[in-house]
Amino acid sequence: NWPPDSGAPDPFEDGVVIDYRVFGSNNPNTIDIPGGGGQLPVKGRTPVHEVGHYFGLRHIWGDGGTLGPNDCAQSDGINDTPFANAQSAFDCDTTRNTCTQVELHYSEDVPDLVENYMDYASEECMNMFTNGQVALMRNVLEGPRSGLLMPFSAVTEAEQVLSFDILPNPSDDQFSVVLEI
């Protein structure tokens, strides 16, 4: 899904690295809005967004301004994601409509999809992927990332009974991982 000249990561550097401070729906942390626009509450959606990239998804505005002009001709490559000419303003404005042409998939003009995990909306309103995005992620998981799939039978009986605790939980500093065999 990434264009050849996009600078996508080298396969040997492949993976997802996510700051521990962005996990959890009851997270007390905030994220600074780029450009000094304030702070956003963290609701655990950043990991979903980043893993979406790992499974082949682009931002819903098609990365205009980064990989091309910021305009309504940019696309994320998914037919059922409405066009947007830029990222959202880190808010939940469901009336925002930056591209007013009729969408072929919907047969009408539809607003920007700020509820989508692949936008930069406030994490409080992110709650969905489109069916097309789900299909692409499944294709990536069954294709280039098929090595992540492992049959259950490959797990030994001893590994099946392992459990662990993270203490204290939640933690904003140091924590311990306790394995129980």
Predicted segments — roles?
Residues 1-48, 54-160:
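Extracellular (secreted or membrane-anchored) zinc-dependent metallopeptidases
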Residues 157-181:
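Surface-exposed, proline-anchored Ser/Thr-rich loop/turn motifs
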